[in-house]
Design a protein with these regions (language model features):
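Short, low-complexity N-terminal intrinsically disordered segments enriched in polar/charged residues
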Residues: 1-39
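Generic, low-specificity signal for short hydrophobic/alpha-helical stretches with a mild N-terminal bias
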Residues: 2-5, 19, 43, 47, ...
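A short linear-motif detector with a strong N-terminal bias
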Residues: 3-5, 18, 25-27, 55-57, ...
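A beta-strand edge to alpha-helix "cap/lid" segment located at domain peripheries
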Residues: 4, 70-81, 85-162
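Short secondary-structure boundary micro-motifs
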Residues: 8-10, 29-31, 37-38, 66-69, ...
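A short, hydrophobic secondary-structure junction motif
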Residues: 15, 19, 23, 42-52, ...
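Alpha-helical protein-protein interaction elements
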Residues: 15-16, 33, 57, 61-64, ...
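A solvent-exposed, acidic/Ser-Thr-rich amphipathic alpha-helical stretch
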Residues: 33-101
Length: 162
């Protein structure tokens, strides 16, 4: 592989990983909008939730995430250890995720009594290149473990969202 080919590969892998890091930064910063969703996901994209339910298409992804994340005062997603494999105009991605969620009914001041939950897992994604831009076409979240308050509420929320 030539140096130019190596540089192109590094740039494309960075473009793909940026899709996830920028998307979840928008979620955590509470500035998610439909333009960010459309810049991240393809028109037929699927998000597969931990319970197996799916959101398909940018509008459904946007509405589903706005509804889901409205339950939290704050979230913080740490996404690491990206492995990206590119084959022509398709790619796969694997990364680890630690997701922190502070329930909306908490006080504004930090407290030892705050209700929260943490989830660790693995993101598995597929991406496609549309024109010159990479977009996520599928994103799954395999939760390895969870801890904290409100796990029953989370499971009930996903059941009601189906």
């Amino acid at each position: 592989m030539t140096t130019d080919e190596q540089i192109k590969l590094i740039v494309e892998k960075t473009q793909i990983t940026d899709l996830l890091t920028r998307y979840f930064a928008a979620v955590d910063d509470k500035r998610l909008d439909i333009q960010i969703v459309k810049a991240t996901f393809s028109n037929e994209a699927r998000i597969i939730r931990p319970d197996g339910s799916e959101m398909i298409g940018p509008e459904n992804i946007f509405e589903g995430h706005i509804k889901s994340f409205a339950r939290f005062k704050a979230t913080h997603h740490v996404i690491t250890n990206f492995i990206v494999d590119i084959h022509d105009n398709k790619a796969t991605l694997r990364s680890n995720v630690i997701a922190n969620h502070l329930w909306a009914d908490n006080d504004d001041a930090p407290s030892l009594n705050n209700k929260y939950f943490l989830a660790d897992g693995v993101f598995s994604a597929k991406a496609i290149k549309i024109d010159k831009y990479w977009r996520i076409s599928e994103l799954g979240n395999n939760v390895i473990w969870r801890t904290g308050d409100g796990m029953k509420e989370m499971l009930n929320f996903f059941k009601q969202s189906k």
